[in-house]
Regions:
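Short beta->alpha transition motifs characteristic of CBS
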Residues: 39-46, 104
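Short beta-strand scaffold segments in enzyme catalytic cores
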Residues: 27-36
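Immediate flanking context of iron-sulfur cluster ligation sites
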Residues: 69-81
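Conserved redox-active cysteine motifs that mediate thiol-disulfide chemistry
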Residues: 81, 85-88
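Zinc-dependent deaminase
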Residues: 1-18, 90-156
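Short, flexible loop/turn motifs enriched in small residues
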Residues: 22-26
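A short, polar/charged loop-to-alpha-helix boundary motif
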Residues: 48-58, 62
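Small-residue (primarily alanine) positions within well-ordered alpha-helices
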Residues: 12, 16-19, 29, 40, ...
Length: 156
């Protein structure tokens, strides 16, 4: 993980804060192309009533509709918290070649008091035959990434 990765993760954490401020769960993600251009950035929209309104899944859907398979393979999905099994599956099927996250799913589960599905993105990707690189969690940003959840659950 390099400085550019960390800068993108910081933006994801900002997006997560914005999502929470808008009445949604605090998750933010962005998709970066092979040339380093930010292609899309999204926040969680579960508060609108759609439990699948995760930004990673929406970005995977966008990528599969707007990018070539080669562009997807060279793209990186950055997210404030490790993608859940649903979102990792979406990334796999879209063919997005790399995932980078600040906070791990296990760290999130500890904050949430165990209310999450404990299946890491690495485990999801390992079941497929298309390699997807995974970088995370980011110790440098763990505290900041966790802070967006303060007071959201009784254990946080």
């Amino acid at each position: 993980m390099d400085r550019t990765d960390i800068a993108h993760l910081r933006r994801c954490i900002e997006l997560a804060r914005a999502a929470r401020g808008g009445g949604h769960e605090p998750f933010g993600s962005l998709l970066v192309g092979t040339d380093g251009t930010v292609l899309q950035e999204l926040t969680n929209t579960v508060g609108s009533g759609d439990v699948t309104g995760h930004p990673e899944l929406a970005l995977a859907s966008w990528a599969s509709r707007h990018l070539t398979p080669e562009a997807c393979a060279g793209a990186t999905l950055y997210t404030s918290c490790e993608s859940c099994a649903m979102c990792a599956g979406g990334q796999y099927w879209a063919g997005i070649g790399r995932l980078v996250f600040a906070l791990s799913g296990e760290q999130l589960a500890d904050l949430a008091g165990g209310t999450t599905l404990r299946l890491s993105s690495r485990e999801v990707f390992a079941r497929g035959n298309v390699p997807i690189a995974v970088d995370g969690p980011c110790p440098e940003l763990a505290s900041d990434a966790a802070s967006v959840f303060e007071g959201l659950w009784p254990s946080s």
